[in-house]
Amino acid sequence: MIKYDFDRKVDRVSTNDMKWHSKAVSSYLNCDIPEDMIPMWLADTDFACAPVIVNALRDRVEKEIFGYCAPMAPFYSAVCGWQKRRFDWDVKPEWITFVPSVVASINIAIRSFTNEGDGVIIQQPVYDPFATIVKNDNRKVVNNGLVHINNEFKMNLEELEALAAKPENKLMVLCSPHNPVGRVWTKEELTAVAEICLKHDVLLVTDEIHADIVYEGYKHYPLLSLDKRYEENFILLTAPSKTFNVAGLKASMSIIPNKELREKFEHTQKAMSLDVRNTFGLECVSAAYTDEGEEWMKQE
C-alpha cells in the first residue's frame, strides 16, 4: 500500500486560487477580507491532489493537443465501477451524462421539468446555490426546513407531504449527504422522501456530491439504488469534486436511468450550451474513480 503525505504544505500562491486570494474572496462575498485571513468558507482542501490524477493529467498534457473531446469507455467504466464498489449500485453507461458541475445539472433539471412560477422544494439550511438557481430561473423557493431536535437535524416529513401535495410544486432538490448540516440520511429517511415524491408526482433530484465523505459508523445510500421505481422516476447527481478536490476541472455526472427524462434533460443541456466537455475533467474522472484513487481517498 502506498503511503501518501497529507502533511506536506502546498504553496497555492500564483495558482489562480479562489479560497486564499483575499481580493477574489472579497469580490465573491461582497465584503472586505484581510490579506492574513484563514479561509474556512469554501469546501476546498489544501493538501496535494491524488497522484493518480496528477499523473493522468500529466500524461494527457504530453500528448500536446487539446481539441474537442467526448466521453469514452474509460470514463463510463470508471463511473460505473466506482458506484458498484463504493455503494453496490449497478449503473449502466447509457444512464450517464457528463455535465460541467452539479450546480449546472440542478439548473438544467429545473428548466427541463418545471415552468416559470412553479415551486421547487428545498430543505434549508442548505447549500446557497439551490435557492439562487430557483430564483434566477423565475421559480418559487418552497422551503421544507430541517428541524433541530436533540442536537441533530431531521426532516419534517409531515410538512414535506403537505408541500408535495400542492400541484404547483413540481420538483424537489435533495442534498444527500446534506450540506451544510452534515446529516447522512438513513435508508428509512430516503425512502420516506422518495415515496412522498412518487405519490404526488414530484420529480426528485438528489445531489450526492458528498457521498464519499462519510464517517465510520454511517453509510451513504444512493437514492436511486433503493428501488427500481426510483431509478425510473428520479435523477441523481454526483462528481469527484469534493472527494478529490478537483472542482476547478469542471466534471460531474448526471445519472438518469429513465430514457425519456434523460433525453429531455440533454435537450435542455444543449440549449443552455452546457453540453461541452473538459478534456482534463474527463481524464480526472477516469483516473480518480480507480482502485488507486480509492486507496488515496481511504488513507487516514
Identify the role of each PLM range.
Residues 2-6, 10-101, 108, 289:
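N-terminal small-domain helix-loop-helix segment of the aminotransferase-like
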Residues 43-45, 176-179, 242:
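Short glycine-rich anion-binding loops that position phosphate/pyrophosphate groups of nucleotides
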Residues 52, 56, 78, 155, ...:
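Alpha-helical elements of Rossmann-like donor-binding domains used by nucleotide-donor carbohydrate transfer enzymes
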Residues 66-195, 212-213, 220-229, 235:
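Conserved core of the PLP fold type I
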Residues 204-205:
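Residue-level marker for buried hydrophobic side chains located in beta-strands
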Residues 208:
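Walker B catalytic acidic pair
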